């Protein structure tokens, strides 16, 4: 019986679907999964499950040679002396006729061709992702070339076209000739289809199609889903902040130097004013845990999406509340001092005794710590657009008591009282000393405040 070989790399959910489809019309044929050094935990788990199936072999390799292992490697020289089928796992094989193997073998013998495989269906034009795919052309434009050179055959729809890994029957006893079979044997290449990509979570998309610099398909999908690479994590665009992520890798470098200075996998970090997550996502892989606090609903949505896409759910706790001098509710909205301020643009702020905004649940700093059982902190980062005025006393007392450093962004111009004198005694308990004049001279300044030991 003709053996099957499926190429695998961090996409085992597709491999599993392909195995199940093949077993529908070839239940007794041996299926070998050739895994090219998968690192994704879910994929490795699925591959382990597949090992328990009858007639399914899973080979785990320590290198990634792409799809060419069966065709080129010495270990498969005996395999190449007989017919075999090689395929990628990202095809929809669910509708193939039950006599597929018989028909492909018949066509191969009839037309004296060493490679006969399935054509890729591009008839659902509206469902295929738009944009540049390969050599500056779209998927439709690229794939159309394989549907032009029709072979005369009164039984089947055949085309002379190169083919290797799209469910291709290889038999090197025949002369070098490649044929794609259309009609009932044309199948979808799933990653090209919006309906398929949209059915996946952003996290699964990013994990499966993770290399847009090499893979034309991954590049196409990342553009469609608006996925960006930022430092050492992945971002899914919320459409509003694309420009920010475009400059992110050079944004506030001194802030990240502070994060790196205190980074430790034995302690956490409290991020008050987390916005869409530029600091949270960075620190999720550098600290034991991140508590992310923000009251902007739009920002929280973007943040939680990006926590999911990076699989940081167990590393980050999101607290969608404002932090204030008391617990309860407070008016919160667009920045009063910036005419172009809007939701989810990093400048939202608390309205102190001013009409406007939306009533938002808030916690005092002390209650924030207590209710969320926050402890063992290496650093506290605060950037809340003037709202630091309302939590300064509780924040500084906590820092002094626990000896926790604070990286505090002052927005003194936006303070209500413009009075720093009452904080001077606290400032003197920190290594930086009295920073009052520094804050007045530079109304928008971030200062590292380390308690004296």
Task: List PLM regions with ranges.
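Conserved catalytic core of nucleotide-sugar-dependent glycosyltransferases
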Residues: 65-77, 93-182
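S-adenosyl-L-methionine
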Residues: 220-363, 370-374, 413-414, ...
